[in-house]
Amino acid sequence: MMTPTELITHYRIVQHSFAPLRLSWWETNRVIAVQIWRDSSFFTRILIAFIGLCLLSIFSRLTRPRSLRRLGIPGAVQPRFSTWSLDFKKVLEDSAKKYPNSPFCLNAFGTEYAVLPSKCYDEVKRLPEHQASAFAFFREAFHGAWTGAGVQTPELGRTIAVELTRGIPSLVHWRQMDCAEAFKMCIGEPSEWREIQLFEAIQRIVISVNSSSFVGRELGTNQNWLRLIYNMPLQLGIPTVILGWTPFLLQPLLKPFLFAPLRMTQRKIKSMLRPVLENDVQEYEASSDKKNLLSPKEQGKVQLTGWLLSRYKGKLDFEVLLQDFITVLFESTPSTASTLFHVVCELAADPALQDMLRQELEEHTDNGSLPQTHLNELRKMDSVMRESARASPFSYLVLYRKLSIPTKLSMGPELPAGTNICVDAHHINTSPDLWDQPHTFDGLRHYRARQQPQNENRYKFANLGSDAPSWGDGLQACPGRMFADNTIKIILTHLLLNYDVKLRPGESKPEKGAMPNGSIVPDVWAKVLFRSRASSAVNEGKK
């Protein structure tokens, strides 16, 4: 058995022996380490491993970013029980009550945030991107170098905000047909009440409808394609959670393994996308009338490839184009599906609300066909959507930003560069100063507000403002909110005109959970009952 003194002596002897070979420092120490390990006893090996882990832990602690608490920012009020059963809403409410005029620290999955009170919403939204960047935050929090999260070119953002928004109305009828195909795949046409696992069905419908618009109906109805897009959020989220509990120094060693499934999925998506985009590029380059080619069409998919090519102006890398499409397909799914899930839950719990929206649809559709507009005519449906987003938002926190320069806000100390900040949205959505009975779902709340002449263009689902925090705000607000608005209305229209939906007997609306970073988690296992209105009517007629 070798003692520590003998180890040091052995190291010096071997080092002296290898001196004539002129090995590098790394090569010499690698050979010595292998030799010492081979000659050591079991006890000595355990001791070496223990010392190594201790040194690694100390180094990791010394090199990790310093906590914001050193600036005097207090920590969030934490419950006594495990964070695995964390009631984040209570954490936020208790912390806001204790620190009404101060930011507080929150650490979730290895990322530390300074959570600012809701009264700071307008101040934070005005911070320019070069000072406080949303994309920089998401790149860091979701390991963008490995996952592609938070990677969006300015050209893509402008294309979504301008050309896509302009092209939505002309495709309404075609998207209704895309939606019908999606429902046929995911729900079927049950003549009797059928249990449907709601979140999975909604997610697949959203993926299919959006994919048909971006890459064509052939891929949008391809089961393998749907599975790949469906898996991406899980393959991003689960490794992110694991890395949050991993020592900082070990994370680079684990990332290649943890994100391997996501990277494999992205490679498969790219291989399926490549022929579609190559066709688009050839069509764009061969066209002599690009203005006509890129104008809104009433059939097929949107001209996303052509719009991007016109903005990149010949400097496009095909891999960048592929990544742009993956970004669009990924970012257009989770928040839209979550919002739609909660709206359907409200409808399932209230048959009278379903009938009211069906009556509105009868007034604004022609044999089931919606007008080729942005669908602002559907005011009651819009109100239900906005109220659902208020009562069941995508996250309790909004305006996530990473500071690139030291920043002094109206409250709290100066925050150093590299600080992650966000704003408490929960106390906007539940503010009694903004909303009457804020803890009650009122589907027509915003419809009634818009009856006032001065509110004609306010209180819409896709509007920005300090009373509608879900989209973010300012120049870094979600550029695809009009597309999401259109998608949800088309899907709800098909559902209401073709299906009845209700909760299972004796059940109430599915409960919501929350992650330690404030994200609201729908009950992904919840089941509701669907029945085809046409099939059930036929059966009733036969009786």
UniProtKB/Swiss-Prot annotation:
This is Cytochrome P450 monooxygenase CYP1. Induction: Expressed exclusively during fungal penetration of host leaves, the time point at which plant defense reactions are triggered. Its cofactor is heme. It is a single-pass membrane protein. It is an enzyme of class 1 (oxidoreductase). It comes from the Eukaryota. One of its GO terms (biological process) is secondary metabolic process. Pathway: Secondary metabolite biosynthesis. The keyword Isomerase does not apply. Cytochrome P450 monooxygenase; part of the gene cluster that mediates the biosynthesis of a tyrosine-derived cytochalasan acting as a fungal signal recognized by resistant rice plants and leads to avirulence in Pi33 resistant rice cultivars. The first step in the pathway is catalyzed by the hybrid PKS-NRPS ACE1, assisted by the enoyl reductase RAP1, that are responsible for fusion of the tyrosine precursor and the polyketide backbone. One of its GO terms (cellular component) is membrane. The keyword Zinc does not apply. Belongs to the cytochrome P450 family. CDD domains: CYP503A1-like (cd11041). Keywords: Glycoprotein, Heme, Iron, Membrane, Metal-binding, Monooxygenase, Oxidoreductase, Transmembrane, Transmembrane helix. Heme binds at residue 478. One of its GO terms (molecular function) is heme binding. It is found in: Membrane. It comes from Pyricularia oryzae (strain 70-15 / ATCC MYA-4617 / FGSC 8958) (Rice blast fungus).
